[in-house]
């Protein structure tokens, strides 16, 4: 190695030779990646400059000494001076582009390892680093002879709420470029694995063949004729400009495949690169991903959520490829959660933000869109508008219960105005009248409060019946009162995921066997969406209209009867609905009156307007304050505050299957990604009050820091899961 070579990365190969990547090579590599990524939204030169500047601090003597010592290249070398390298590029950016670049270049460069900072911290950070450098702005070794490239202004006009997404998107381009160029040098095998992937143009014929096969092998029954009509309308409407679209199809109308064919053809027509399907429940994700893999092959579908089992893919190379793809979403088809999608859009962490630039120029399907959090609805909808306007993203909202996301809703009491999307184009015209053609259920509503025993007696009159309630306690109480003739099942999140999945599969198998005459199930809301089951009769505890119609979607799903009934009931006063969202939703439904066509889209619109008028805010954590002033972007603070699922509980490992063996493996070998994934299948989430109660009972122990285990078999019931009688049971299950 020549003395003047400035090292960016180095490693020792199997033959003991040192392989070096110079800082010039790395900076050029990052610049080329970032230029390409930012070019997708017209900001290629911004990406290139970020790449060129981000590691200028590595030119200092102190950093060169540091990297040689830490790598073992010169283990005895003395390190003197400030080894922090990220801030140097930020100082140069300020010299070249002045204060106007504070939010769009300085922050990205100084934060490319640590995470984006709040605006008011940036100058303080740089000044602190200058002081560490003996009050010199830059180490004398750093070459600042860099051409000041004129950066073009964005071709799009930006409003106040757009700037934070623009800033974060530039950051995404830089950090993913940095990760990828480093990987190409340090781990060429992984980098090579990433490269083999198909385009949507390659995959579209596979979907078209699947649709032809389905049509050829299906009869001409009414339901199949309707599904074909929906698909043909989606194909017709796919030849449209990038924008906002909705697909409102009742249960049984073939929404999954129809939305997919629209998205694929729309993307190919508009030159969009990938399809991202965001879903609120992991149970729906698993089903949807399975359908997609059967069409496109498992090598073309990325399933990204916390419950994915990495070992479900047997091919080790494909397993590694999918794992790598979760890092930056460079894949043609992605199925993920709403939480993963939206919390990434508001994150400040490099490992999370690196995927954002791959949302650019894509089609996003938001499934069961009515489940979007009301508490964050305004910043979420504003982010959708920004991604459409700045980043060429088309959005498709799919559900049987379409919420109101367009227009302005104000004049409510309390005064909580909601500013929606200017225009959302519905794919299915009114004259299709799908809610009439696909009607297989009627609602019978009784608002008089019933006792547990009265509801149990009503359920016992039916041989096959599903009852959905709002709380874990209600599920437990009703289940324990039901007669145990035939098959009687309980479903709630007091069962660990492995137990829950096993019970749902047992239920599906039982329903397919006509010899199982009696099947009675009591469940919390977890079964309302994404669990493909069919009962002749459904009971649903009072709730919002969207939840009731979701429950009705489990009733006569296959149309085996002319018309079935979903009964809506209330429990007596001592079992009132939990205050908050559930009570608001039920109140909005009750305010519609009783003489309603409950399944009509107009009724759903009226319901959501009633519901919105009961909300004090659609921006619970005040994202507007943190993010809507371009001169003061609190990106770090906003990321901490934007939590769609507030993690107020404690996870405990319960005694089920081989969970205790996994705990022992962890204690002996320490934690690993694969082991923690396996162990997560045996965890139940409880709140702090009940966690403390279990501790006082002496049944929970901390086996390792942060790992709490209940290893008493008698504490975990094979039918209802973790046994505990406390206030946690009254908490509404949202997921």
Q: What kind of region is each of these model predictions?
A:
Residues 2-209:
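Accessory nucleic-acid engagement/destabilization modules that flank
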Residues 9-12, 303-316, 470-473, 488-508, ...:
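Conserved helicase motor
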Residues 105, 388, 453-462, 468, ...:
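C-terminal helicase lobe and adjacent C-terminal extensions/tails of nucleic-acid helicase motors
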Residues 241-263:
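Walker A/P-loop
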Residues 272-296, 305-308, 404:
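Conserved Walker A/P-loop ATP-binding site and its immediately adjacent core
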Residues 297-346:
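Inter-Walker segment of RecA-like/P-loop motor cores
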Residues 338-342, 352-390:
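SF2 helicase catalytic motif II
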Residues 401-460:
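Interdomain hinge/linker at the junction between the two RecA-like core domains of SF2 helicases
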